[in-house]
Amino acid sequence: MSARKSSSRKSAGEFERASAAAKFIHKQTKLRPRIALVLGSGLGAFADEFAGAKKIPYAKIPHFPQSTAIGHAGQLVLGKVDGVEVAGMQGRVHLYEGYTPQQVVFPVRVFARMGVKAVILTNAAGGVNLNYSAGALVAIRDHINLQGVNPLIGPNDDRFGVRFPDMTQAYDPEFRKFVADAGKRLKQNLHEGVYLGLSGPNYETPAEIHSFRTLGADLVGMSTVPEVLAARHAGIRVLGISCVTNMAAGVTGNALTAEEVFEVGARVKNDFIALLKAVIPRIAEAIA
């Protein structure tokens, strides 16, 4: 590992762009959330639960990337959950949409400039673990990055974070305990697992899924990993939650479709919302 001195050439302008976006958002509301959520495919309905919501289309936020994926509303919603101020992204952008890794993580860097201290990253994922079934909610314990890219490659901007961020506990153990505790109280059958990130947009082959299982993956998806890297780079604590919307290729023999993702997301909506409502106040206490 090289210990060359960090350089701020990396994103000449990226820090300023993130700061400008954060300033714009702050001008739209008096809310100053310290918790942010990225709501994945079929999971955006949680933001509709926010009290006193202020909705800002991504298109109005300076430099903010635009969602093109089906089912991603493309707006930032600020409001309160049980009195806790939060910001929720209804939809994210992905590498498969043609965005660069830096564009994919730009919203996370905006959150950092807004003063966010914890981010909840949610996604729809394929179940690799044969003990899972469609509709299962899984707290991410760790990840395997096979996306072939990393948003931290290039000269480092020390204003975002250190050159070599540690990923030993990328997914916060305390936050994962909050999820486990909430699951018991709510009588939800929750899991913990390892998420494997790919670029997409095609679904995986059965042979790939078999190999991922031998690597120790429990879940597979096309998002989240870059956001985790950027969040930890910025010192933001991370909770990752996957909704298993389908069993991965080769498990059932059925073809995979995007429609299935949204159908299952709608089916687990109430459990998903109840879980987040139970966890958010505890995260707020932990970062106070």
Q: What name fits each language-model region?
A:
Residues F111-G115, R213, R232:
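Non-catalytic positions within long, well-ordered alpha-helices that form the structural scaffold/packing
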Residues K117-A118, D218, R237:
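Short acidic/polar active-site loop segments enriched in Thr and Asp
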Residues M222-E260:
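Zn-dependent metallopeptidase/amidohydrolase metal-coordination segment
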Residues V108, I209, V225-V228:
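Generic hydrophobic/aromatic pocket-lining and core-packing "Φ" positions
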Residues S2-K5, R9-M167:
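Metabolite-binding pocket within alpha/beta catalytic cores that recognizes anionic/polar moieties
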Residues R176, D181-D218, I283-A284:
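Active-site/ligand-binding-proximal alpha/beta "capping" segment
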